[in-house]
Each structure stands twice: as structure tokens, then as C-alpha cells.
Curated annotation (Swiss-Prot):
This is PP2A regulatory subunit TAP46. GO terms for molecular function: protein phosphatase 2A binding. GO terms for cellular component: cytosol. InterPro entries: TAP42/TAP46-like_sf, TAP46-like. Residues 158-184, 351-403 are annotated as: Disordered. Involved in the regulation of the TOR signaling pathway. Seems to act as a regulator of PP2A catalytic activity. Residues 174-184, 366-375 have a biased composition (Acidic residues). Residues 376-391 have a biased composition (Basic and acidic residues). GO terms for biological process: regulation of dephosphorylation; regulation of signal transduction. Gene3D superfamilies: TAP42-like family (1.25.40.540). It comes from Nicotiana tabacum (Common tobacco). Disruption phenotype: RNAi plants show severe growth retardation, the formation of spontaneous disease-like nectrotic lesions leading to premature cell death. The defective plants also display a strong reduction in protein synthesis, and chromatin bridge formation at anaphase. Disulfide bonds: none annotated.
Amino acid sequence: MGELSMQEMPLPALFEQGSKIHASAESSVDQDTVRKGCEILRQCEEMIGKLGLFSVNETKEDISTANLKYILVPYYLAELTEKVADNDRIKVLKASQAKLKEFISFCETMELVPEEEIETSTQGGANSSVDRRAKKIARFKRQRAAESKLLEIKERKERRGRSTKAAALSSPVETEEDDVLDDDGEEEREAWLTTISLGLCKAFDLLEMLKKEEEILSAVKEKQLQDGEREFSQAILDERTKKVETWHRDAAARAHHTKPAAPITCATFAQDVIEGRAKVSQAHEHKHQPLIFGPASLVGRNPTTEREKIAAQVFQPHYRLPTMSIEEAGLTEMNMMNEWQERNVKLMEEANSSWYKDTPKSRPGEDDEEDDDDAAQDKARAWDDWKDDNPRGAGNKKLTPCG
């Protein structure tokens, strides 16, 4: 069998392949491999968005252990994007910084960023060299602690695996696996949370480094433009403007004839896609847009800013939201009724068919039973006739004195 294409691969397989490319890119930089890894991780991001695995209303405790690893996708994509060789280095740096900021912002929403990092970001960064040095030392300590913890979890898992294998070989009795599975689940969650913490430490350092590199390159480019070594001609600008206008016209023309696909509303469909039992089409898009029951619904307008969206989500229903509309429920019941009527019509046709109207043939033993009944009736009639001819006591009349 041939290999599955990137669109047909399930999300766990895509993430595993992308993480392997990310790990191998740390030692050797092959541009084809790096670009392939970026493409795979972008496909992961697109599938995560369509499946709606994460919500801004959740924290790290609300995310399942199986989905924790997908938080690292923007971080892996940022590191691979930074390694892409391109003539426009500033464009690569901006793309990598955007993914790093997206990763840090989402981790902050999930309450995964340390308090000291949040305080530093709210204050606009450390001003003095002493503050910057203290921040780097604290970050380095967290990074070393996370690396040591990951190594400890790995060694503990290997030891437990060896002991379990030895116990299975020495004892023929099957051991209980519930405790082992619980330990594995707790260790897996702890390992992914530690990996995310390690990724945050590296992401902050990489973001600072990329900002400095962008500042240097921007200064060099500005100096080159001022010196006249490299200028954009008016023809190039006109050509780019023409391309943009053409693209917008084509997009507007497609929008009139393109019907957007219905969003994925079934909660189990996302899990089916994750485990590879179903495929998600390119047209589907699933976003967390819950029904609004808060202030925005009272004033009769849709929320536009993030503040209005959060305020609109204050008053939420205490009951479970419906999974289908009234029209869909009516169609389902109508289909059930049609099937029931078709089944009844079929049964009535079978009941009125000639096979049921024909008189059933007598069985082989019924003729013998009828003959036995006639013989018994003849015998009973003969006995009655004899009793009429010979009344009771008629044979003893000669023995009586008056006889």
C-alpha cells in the first residue's frame, strides 16, 4: 500500500511526523526537510482549528491529556520557520515571531506561563541590565529543571517497563493493568506539561533574539535604501498593485458563486477525525462560537471586540444545548414514519396474497383421526340400541316369586 497523502493523514500521525522533523532540524538543517516540516505543521494547525480542540474559555485542567501536545504546534512551526533560508530574511523573522507570540499568548490563556514572565511582559520588559540578567537566570533555572524532570520521567518509565516485562515473564498469572495505565496517563500528562514549560523558556529567548536580529537587518536595509544601493522602481510597485487588485477581483467573483460548507456540529466527529476513522474536507471549518445568552443578546447586536464576547458569555444556560434543529428533528421523525408505513403496507400485501387465501391442506394424520371418531360414534349408537332392547334387570324376572 502506498503512503497516505498529507490531507488523508490523521492528526496524531501528522503531529508525530512534524515533531520528528523538528527534533532532527536541531542537529542538521536540510532546507527540503525544513520546508516539508513547516507544511506538515501548518496542516496540523489547520486541522486543529477545524476540529475546535481548544477554546479561550478553557484552562490547562480542562484540556485532555491526548490533546496537550497540540499546544506545541505553533512553537515547533516558529522554530522551523526561523531555519528557512530566504532572500527576504526580515519576512522570515516576522513570520517566526508571529508564531512565537501566538504560542506564548495561548499558553498565557491556558495559565501555563509563569507569573514572573507575565509581570515582565505587562511592564514592557526589563529596563536595566540587572533586571534582564535576573530574568535570564530565572528562565535558565526553569529550563534546566524542566530538562531534568523530563529525563527523570523517561528513566522512571523505562524502569517500570523493564520491571513489568520481568514480572510477566516470571509469573504466568496475569497482573492488574489498571494501576499501570493510570501511572502512564499521569506520567504522560506531566511529561507534556513539562515539555510545554521547556518550550516557553526557549520561546522567550528565541523571541528576544529574533527581535534583535530584525532591528539590525532593518537598520541595514534602511541605510542601503538611503544610499541608493537598492531601490524599488515604480514599475515593480505598479505590478504588485495590479496583482493585488486582480486577486481581490477574483476573490469577490468566487464569493458570489461559492456556498460555504456547514460547520461541524457533532461532538464525536472531531474525535473520529483525530483517531483516523473519518476525514475532514477542506471546506469545513469549525470555530468556538457558542450561542449568546448574555448582554449582547439583550441589546440585539453581535459582539465585535474581545471584551464584548467575554461579557456575552457571562450568562450561559444551565441545560445542554440542542444537537439538531426543529426542522432536522421533524425530518428524522418523518423518515421514521415513512419507513413504518412502508413496512405495514408490505405486511398487508403479504397477508392478502393468494398464499394466505388458499385453504390449507390436511395433514397426513388427520384422516386417521376422523375414521377413529366415526367408529367410536357407531359403537356408542350400537350400545345405546342394545340398552333400549335390554332394559336393566330384564334377565332376572324369572327368579322373582311373582315371575
